[in-house]
A protein has these predicted regions:
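Long, low-complexity, charge-rich intrinsically disordered regions
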Residues: 1, 83-199
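Short alpha-helical segments that sit at the start of domains
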Residues: 1-18
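Short, amphipathic alpha-helical "recognition" segments used to contact nucleic acids or chromatin
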Residues: 18-26
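Short acidic, hydrophobic short linear motifs in intrinsically disordered regions
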Residues: 25-38
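A short, conserved structural fragment
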Residues: 53-64
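Minor-groove-contacting beta-hairpin "wing" of winged helix-turn-helix DNA-binding domains
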Residues: 65-73
Length: 199
């Protein structure tokens, strides 16, 4: 029988599997391949596959003993249809001293967006790190000196996971601006999304 249709959002592990599918640029993504790349237990991966299957956007099938996921949609269309299930990876945001920046952090927010589009960079540099690697108690809510502080986003998953440079990956970056009302940012996000999914 058909699995119940998904209402609500993907859990973050499913979102990562979805991103892996988008970035793999292949029609079929073998679950065993995904298991090698994603930092999940086998059980978490199985759940993520099941959740993708409940969306009608993916087909889960087997070739011999190898399970795979496949979508009938092109990447740009798939992303548009999946947007209702996707969430911003940003769990918390605050400020830290510039001296606290580590190599586990990558550019994110407006800083990363301005590197990849026509958007002018904001004065305060934004970084991201997985919430697992950073104690949120160390964030301050107040920006006192933009020359001495940076903005830090704590993400639900590692912003380096799909990154190809020193910034968070493009699609997660797009998702991190889900709640923006700034037209300049919306334009830049659209530009980045379009370019990334046309490839």
């Amino acid at each position: 029988k058909d699995p119940p249709k998904l209402t609500g959002k993907f859990v973050y592990s499913t979102q990562q599997l979805f991103l892996l599918y988008l970035y793999s640029k292949k029609k079929r993504l073998y679950i065993s391949e995904a298991g090698k790349v994603l930092p999940f237990t086998a059980m978490t991966l199985t759940r993520a596959v099941k959740q993708l299957e409940t969306t009608d956007l993916f087909l889960v099938a087997k070739e011999g003993v190898n399970k795979f996921i496949e979508s009938k949609y092109k990447r740009d269309e798939l992303f548009e249809k999946a947007k209702v299930y996707l969430t911003t990876p940003v769990r918390k945001t605050g400020y830290i001293d510039k001296t606290q920046v580590t190599e586990n952090m990558v550019f994110a927010g407006e800083t990363a967006l301005s590197e990849k589009t026509m958007l002018n960079p904001s004065r305060v540099v934004t970084y991201a790190i997985s919430e697992k690697y950073y104690d949120k108690a160390l964030l301050t809510d107040e920006l006192i000196d933009p020359d001495k502080q940076v903005r830090l986003e704590l993400w639900a998953y590692n912003p380096k996971q799909f990154s190809e440079d020193n910034s968070a990956d493009d699609i997660s970056l797009v998702l991190s601006f889900t709640d923006t009302n700034d037209e300049r940012i919306e334009e830049a996000v659209d530009e980045l999304q379009e370019r990334r999914l046309q490839e």
